Amino acid sequence: FLLCSFLMIILYPVGIDLYLVAVPQIAQTLQASEAQIHTAFSIYLFGMAATVLLGGIIADRHGRRWVVLGGALIFVIASLVAANATGISQFYLGRFGQGAGAGALYIMTFTVLRDVLSQARLAMALSMINGVICVIPVLAPVLGYLILSRFDWRGIFVAMALVAAVSGLVNLLLLKETRPARQQSGATRPLALLGSPRFMLHSLLTSASVTAILVYVSVSPLILMQGLGFTTEQYAIVMMVMAGVSM
């Protein structure tokens, strides 16, 4: 289950961090403005947010595997749509689909682990998952640079599709259905959490910290590479160092 969970969770940071070194090239190819590139980043996050709640509801009713495999398939297709984009609108569509697929697998990572592990082992597993989330931002800019040194920016999105395909295939072969035969009380009322002060407080604190990170990630490619003249290699090194420090 840990291997399956690792392969589920990596799509979320891969979809954010792998393509950052190519942002100026994408903007030039698609003749997109700085605002449009930032919008594409926001659309990815909106796709994630839209499917986190929906994915949980579907998983509770129809099973975890359907959401995992469906999310991986959506991510593959969306990555290829983005890779073949000829205009910013098609790129937006691909990014939204990537976010939707990543969001489905993101929520299923924690759902599956909660289904099969005790509280003590769950805490340990979540620490390991957090380690994976921290490592990806260190490696992704470098991997993106290596891909960009051989291909154009479209190759990065093909690589994303391959990662999602591997994730989907491994989960298809190894992941067993973990949905409990009897749902816990309140499982069918996900919106009830919005009335919990503790949940809302934790959500706001987490959102504030994540927002700061995502704002930096969103604006840094254009500021450093276009504004300050950093090369893709220099930008990849800066991102790797910053991610390493944050760990």
Place the predicted regions along the sequence by residue:
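Cytoplasmic helix-loop-helix junction between adjacent transmembrane helices
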Residues: 94-133
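Conserved MFS/SLC helix-loop-helix module at the cytosolic interface between two early adjacent transmembrane helices
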Residues: 50-89
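Extracytoplasmic
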Residues: 1-34, 216-221
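Helix-breaking motifs and short loop linkers at transmembrane-helix boundaries and internal kinks
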Residues: 29-31, 63, 84-90, 101, ...
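Helix-loop-helix hairpin linking two adjacent transmembrane segments in secondary transporters
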Residues: 90, 119-120, 124-173
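Short hydrophobic/alpha-helical segments at membrane-entry points of transmembrane helices
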Residues: 89-95, 201-202
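Juxtamembrane intracellular "pre-TM" segments in multi-pass secondary transporters
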Residues: 178-202
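Residue-level signature of mid-helix packing/kink "hotspots" within the transmembrane helices
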Residues: 17, 45-53, 137-138, 243-247
